[in-house]
């Protein structure tokens, strides 16, 4: 069984982890957190979580995931807290930054199995969603996407503990919002599971159209496929392609850089390589020829720009994500013809966003 820490005493945790100790320094707005700083709040959340009936019936493995997520849920209030001119205290963006912190912690410093790590990351990223879902422009789409990243049943459980682990005047209203979130999940068949679609094409149609009906099934199907590789330099994308797709057309940004003598740190040169690669892709797309786009594609923004291009030509897009343990990453990078400087590799690692199920028609993870 994976455990984040066998010892869960707060004093022990503060001594072991600086990022826990510094929670004592982070103040919160007393209107919403009259209990005090982030350290006090986090301890109250952990205590509330333990006594929740829904938590107590979980397996020990699942309890550990939720415990770790609760421990980490406000970790980046440290870097995002602002004392506003009107006297309020805000921490906008702490969930997104907290998710990045959790991924780095559980990939580099305290390695966790991929599925466990990403579930914790998802819980940290979306821990406020049950409260704020209905204030989003498209609550249903936001929910469907979240269900494809994280267990919504656990998310509601974490949100409930988060709300019970504070002192505030609007607690009853916030708990009612969580009840509404649970009901909305159940109504839309994504309570504790990813929302299913009849096909990858139906899923992509819904994701790419603002007014799409959730259960709409498009008549036409894609005629060809683009495989979008994703993974850090040195993760083994080239090896994976040679093994599984030896006969496919490949657009490789690394190979183009090597051929032209362009450094991975040359922004102008890399911009030219990307434009050339896109022009070559358009040639294949117009001919409806299947091919592989081989590059790092380590952020959602990078991937979505390419996926928008590919789907404009009605291609089916499959994301293939490749990962190796961090301890192997630098060694494998050094053995490549197109090796990336260590500082660049670490920067990419710290910005890494794992592909989500909703991003493409199909997604596969290959984690060693």
Where do the model's predicted regions map?
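Acidic/His-rich, divalent-metal-binding segments that scaffold phosphate/diphosphate chemistry
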Residues: 1-83
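Active-site metal-coordination segments of metallo-dependent hydrolases
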Residues: 30-44, 86-100, 273, 296-299
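Divalent metal-dependent catalytic cores for phosphoryl transfer on phosphate-bearing substrates
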Residues: 51-177
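N-terminal pre-Walker A segment at the start of P-loop NTPase domains
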Residues: 186-221
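Glycine-rich phosphate-binding P-loop
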Residues: 225-245
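Conserved GTP-binding G-domain of TRAFAC-class P-loop NTPases and closely related GTPase folds
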Residues: 227, 247, 326-368
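Conserved substrate/cofactor phosphate-moiety recognition/catalytic segment
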Residues: 238-291, 326-330
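Conserved phosphate-donor/acceptor-positioning beta-strand/loop module used by diverse small-molecule
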Residues: 313-332
């Amino acid at each position: 069984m994976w455990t984040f820490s066998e010892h869960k005493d707060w004093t022990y945790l503060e001594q072991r982890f600086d990022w826990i100790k510094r929670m004592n320094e982070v103040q919160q707005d007393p209107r919403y957190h009259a209990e005090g700083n982030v350290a006090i709040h986090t301890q109250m959340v952990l205590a509330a979580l333990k006594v929740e009936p829904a938590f107590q019936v979980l397996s020990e493995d699942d309890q550990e995931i939720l415990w770790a997520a609760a421990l980490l849920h406000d970790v980046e209030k440290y870097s995002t807290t602002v004392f506003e001119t009107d006297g309020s205290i805000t921490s906008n963006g702490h969930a997104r930054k907290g998710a990045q912190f959790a991924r780095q912690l559980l990939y580099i410093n305290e390695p966790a199995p991929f599925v466990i790590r990403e579930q914790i990351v998802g819980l940290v990223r979306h821990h406020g969603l049950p409260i704020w879902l209905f204030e989003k422009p498209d609550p249903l789409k936001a929910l469907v996407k979240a269900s494809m990243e994280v267990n919504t049943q656990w998310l509601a459980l974490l949100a409930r503990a988060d709300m019970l682990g504070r002192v505030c005047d609007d607690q009853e209203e916030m708990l009612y919002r969580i009840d509404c979130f649970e009901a909305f999940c159940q109504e839309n068949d994504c309570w504790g599971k990813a929302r299913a679609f009849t096909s990858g094409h139906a899923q992509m149609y819904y994701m790419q159209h603002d007014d799409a009906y959730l259960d709409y099934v498009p008549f036409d199907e894609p005629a060809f496929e683009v495989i979008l590789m994703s993974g850090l330099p040195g993760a083994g994308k080239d090896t994976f392609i040679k093994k599984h797709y030896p006969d496919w057309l490949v657009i490789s940004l690394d190979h183009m850089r090597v051929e032209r003598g362009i450094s991975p740190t040359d922004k102008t040169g890399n911009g030219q390589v990307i434009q050339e690669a896109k022009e070559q892709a358009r040639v294949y797309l117009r001919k409806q020829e299947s091919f592989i786009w081989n590059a790092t594609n380590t952020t959602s923004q990078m991937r979505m720009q390419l996926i928008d291009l590919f789907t404009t030509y009605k291609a089916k897009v499959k994301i293939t994500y490749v990962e190796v343990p961090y301890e192997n990453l630098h060694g494998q990078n050094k053995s490549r013809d197109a090796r990336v400087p260590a500082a660049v590799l670490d920067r990419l690692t710290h910005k890494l966003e794992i592909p989500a199920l909703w991003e493409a028609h199909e997604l596969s993870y290959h984690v060693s």
